[in-house]
A protein has these predicted regions:
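Basic, flexible Lys/Arg- and Gly-enriched helix-loop patches that mediate nucleic-acid binding at interfaces
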Residues: 2-207
Length: 207
């Protein structure tokens, strides 16, 4: 907006350049041009981000920069009807985990994507410290018991990629789940990357 890239048209009137980032418009009859291309107006924001390592999915990080600092200020400060302003992370990734992170200010969307009852698959590419073998793959598929829950947790999919790599699909989102599941089968996660949530994958332009 401040660069003069945005033009606004209301109720069929000619487009007029907007340079005020705090300007408010009635969405009824609103049309937008950004650098000459028409953009649809969206009431809610949906962001697909490639989270780098060394960032926290928190508005108040404890030891590493917040992933929210990667976003433009208008998205961080986007007004909402809730007490919290701006978009929120749809689930979280550990600070050392990279990959697909969704952010939105649509509460219903966040609930649909994170509710355990919805069984939204999440795909992780795992690099391990020790070689991956068929026994470990089988155990992950059959289920392993984590230290805080007597109920076995199963991987929805476990695919061997290389001697120290596998692709793991989970339907839950427990705390440090991938790392704890690999530890339960006698291995250790060295690198962790989330490549997919449901049908959404990281596009090549963000890899």
């Amino acid at each position: 907006v401040q660069q003069g890239w945005v033009e606004v048209s209301l109720d069929g009137q000619p487009f007029d350049k907007c340079t005020d980032s705090s300007a408010e418009y009635d969405p009824e009859g609103l049309r937008l041009l950004v650098q000459g291309q028409e953009w649809p107006w969206c009431e809610k924001a949906y962001i697909l981000l490639h989270k780098p390592a060394g960032t926290e999915c928190s508005q108040k990080p404890s030891a590493y920069p917040s992933v929210y600092t990667l976003l433009p200020a208008p998205l961080r400060q986007r007004p909402t009807k809730n007490a919290i302003q701006g978009v929120q992370a749809v689930g979280r990734l550990d600070q050392d985990t990279t990959g697909l992170l969704l952010l939105s200010d649509d509460g219903q969307f966040i609930h649909r994507m994170t509710s355990p009852k919805k069984h939204v698959p999440k795909v992780y590419e795992v690099t391990t410290k020790h070689p991956v073998d068929a026994r470990q793959i089988l155990k992950l598929l059959e289920g392993v018991v984590l230290d805080d829950d007597p109920t076995a947790v199963k991987a929805a999919g476990a695919e061997f990629i290389g001697s120290h790599q596998l692709k793991l699909t989970l339907l839950e989102g427990k705390y440090h789940q991938v790392k704890r599941m690999l530890a339960a089968v006698g291995n250790r996660v060295e690198q962790l990357h989330r490549s997919q949530i449901g049908a959404l994958e990281l596009p090549e332009s963000l890899k």
